[in-house]
């Protein structure tokens, strides 16, 4: 648990609301609302699909004991470490930046606008994604499961290559993790993502390889 990342973690809701507000200001209430509804329908789809997994398993981790502080207490009371595989935090931030990447192009935003806002949305998506481990205290398995789910249910927005890029950028600028540990973390996430992608390629239900993995997984239990 790394309290310094709490503010970033708590930006999760504001992260996907800010672009909605921007659409309202740019296009007006009528058109801006249509674009916002389009995004919210994707959100709804993601939550419905993730719910199907959570009826099977709510979490794969035990939260380790952390130094007591108000920040720790507030986060752990308000946000239990459930909804783990796939992580909705990862799903939503990746959906957000990929949706608006598509929308900025479709709605004829200028090249400068697209470059600036795509860069900002992506960088914050990566930062919030990292806090899933720093603050939420999921296992690394929640990340590849989320990326895999998105490639299956929103392939028009989120591709396997986008998932690989996201994985490669995780913890790139972190100073509290050794280079060796960064490599090990990212390599494992990449391995799990590719495994799920390959095993799910011929399945009608994207959940099949995730459930297969869950059935064989034994979580680490802190002593």
Language model regions located:
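Alpha-helical transmembrane segments that form the membrane-embedded catalytic/substrate-binding core
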Residues: 92-96, 130-163
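Hydrophobic alpha-helical bundle signature of multipass membrane enzymes
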Residues: 1-85, 91-132
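Primarily interfacial, aromatic-capped hydrophobic alpha-helices that serve as membrane anchors
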Residues: 161-223
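Generic low-polarity alpha-helical segments
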Residues: 17, 21, 39, 45-53, ...
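Generic recognition of cysteine residues
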Residues: 8, 46, 66, 84, ...
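Functional transmembrane or membrane-interface alpha-helices that line membrane-embedded catalytic
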Residues: 109-118, 147-175
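Charged/polar, low-hydrophobicity segments characteristic of intrinsically disordered regions
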Residues: 52-58, 133-147, 183-191
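Detector for Asparagine
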Residues: 14, 74, 118, 141, ...
